[in-house]
């Protein structure tokens, strides 16, 4: 037997009636778990984005205290973990990227160009690169995929031309028939 639960949404405008949803117990449980998960993620993000929340030296001391043995005379097997620098808070949040981190330009040689890659079969070894238009988007494809696309387009065009010719012939035949009275 499936029991249903009435759920009232929060009202943002006092002039509007609240939204009422009829959910099964399982859907209600899933929705509650999702709300709890989202709330936890928001609090974690607020903590991580707050640069004044805790100094990195304090964090290192906390890590060292957790790894030290409680009795200094006994070696109870607790090993000191290597402490690596903790991640810095996110800065330069731009509207184009959800999370962008400041990057320093590298000195010396310019970066190597990325190898070309076929956007259909993902190969990067071909004697000839082609451009193909798929759904109004121009994409770079390898020679093999480009030839396959060309053959498909050619066969489709031939079929369309053949159908148009048949339709024209049928129309001519209909036009040539004398009208019987």
UniProtKB/Swiss-Prot annotation:
Keywords: Metal-binding, Zinc, Zinc-finger. It comes from the Eukaryota. A zinc finger (GATA-type) spans 118-145. GO terms for biological process: regulation of DNA-templated transcription. GO terms for molecular function: zinc ion binding. This is GATA zinc finger domain-containing protein 22. It comes from Dictyostelium discoideum. The gene is gtaV.
């Amino acid at each position: 037997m499936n029991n249903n639960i009435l759920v009232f949404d929060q009202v943002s405008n006092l002039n509007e009636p609240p939204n009422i949803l009829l959910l099964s117990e399982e859907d209600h449980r899933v929705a509650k778990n999702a709300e709890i998960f989202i709330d936890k993620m928001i609090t974690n993000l607020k903590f991580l984005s707050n640069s004044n929340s805790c100094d990195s030296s304090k964090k290192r001391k906390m890590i060292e205290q957790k790894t030290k043995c409680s009795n200094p005379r006994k070696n109870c097997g607790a090993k000191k973990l290597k402490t690596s620098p903790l991640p810095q808070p996110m800065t330069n949040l731009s509207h184009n990227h959800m999370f962008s981190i400041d990057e320093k330009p590298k000195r010396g040689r310019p970066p190597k160009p990325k190898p070309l890659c076929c956007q259909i079969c993902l190969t990067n070894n071909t004697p000839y690169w082609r451009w193909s238009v798929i759904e109004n988007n121009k994409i770079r494809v390898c020679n093999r995929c480009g030839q396959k696309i060309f053959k498909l387009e050619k066969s489709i065009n031939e079929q369309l031309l053949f159908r148009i010719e048949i339709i024209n012939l049928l129309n001519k035949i209909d036009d040539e028939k004398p009208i019987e009275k």
